[in-house]
Amino acid sequence: PMTRFIAEGRAVLETARRTKQIFQIGTYGRFEQKTEMRKIIRAGFAKGREVRIIRRGGFKVGQWSGPIQIDPRPVPDYLDWEMYCGPSPLKPFHPPRFGGMHRGYWDYDGGGLTDMGQHHLDPLCFAMGKDDEHPVEITAHAPPAHPEVTGMWGWSRLAYADGVELILESGEWGKPHGLKEKGIGRGDLTEAERRQLDEIPDEDPLVGFGEAVKTRVQAGGNADTSHHSVCLMHLTNLAIRTGRTIKFDPEKEVAIGDEGANRLINQPMRAPWHL
């Protein structure tokens, strides 16, 4: 993922804006999305209609759930363990925390959800017209979370202020949510809305990184859009880890009335690292 927690992403976004540097996260599919649904939703025509997008599977939840009871081992001679841990807490070394299995520990990552999630959800953010918007209510169906090790989850529901819903479904745990996907297209609009839609000019094509460096036009998948897409995984993990529905303030980027969730939104960093 672009970041490990929400406040870290806000710092990246604000730094990119302040310095006017070209920034891009390379994810699968953003440049291949059709834009009709995006245009309809951004025009405000989703309000009052049922719009629900479901992303099924591909999150590698079981594959990247970390082992729990592993005895500490001596640090290998070739590894600077303190530097490897970086801003995360300095924990005793054991092999699963190093290399690919690091994804299964909250200290370093967010499990299979954040491992593959940004690839899957970044294009959906674009297609749904939510590149600059956060969901306001997040619910997850999962067993109680371990404090250090990522684990299984079944599904999450992320609802936006305009009523658009995104459902993430792992297919690896628990009962299904029972909800049906419902997109939105021209056929769902009134004649007057279709005329309004036709009057809205098409957006400029997304710019690749090389062209962005030359032209200084921000690339597709820039810090703003990537922060909003990675927050979908971070917010789902908040609901999983707390076991609660998260009411999220999309402007302040805080959980409303939930200090436990807010401690995960802005996590301490081990010195000398800081935001």
Task: List PLM regions with ranges.
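Non-transmembrane alpha-helical segments in soluble domains
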Residues: 13, 38, 42, 85, ...
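NAD(P)-dinucleotide binding in Rossmann-like oxidoreductases
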Residues: 142-204
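Active-site rim elements
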Residues: 25-27, 71, 106-114, 139-145, ...
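A contiguous active-site-proximal alpha/beta segment in oxidoreductase catalytic domains
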Residues: 3-80
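Structural recognition of the beta-strand scaffold that forms the well-ordered cores
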Residues: 4, 22-27, 49-53, 83-85, ...
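Rossmann-like dinucleotide-binding domain that binds NAD(P)(H)
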Residues: 82-162
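Acidic/polar loop patches that form or flank catalytic/metal-binding clefts of enzymes
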Residues: 47-51, 92-95, 130-140, 165-168, ...
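C-terminal helix-rich "cap/oligomerization" subdomain common to oxidoreductases
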Residues: 211-275
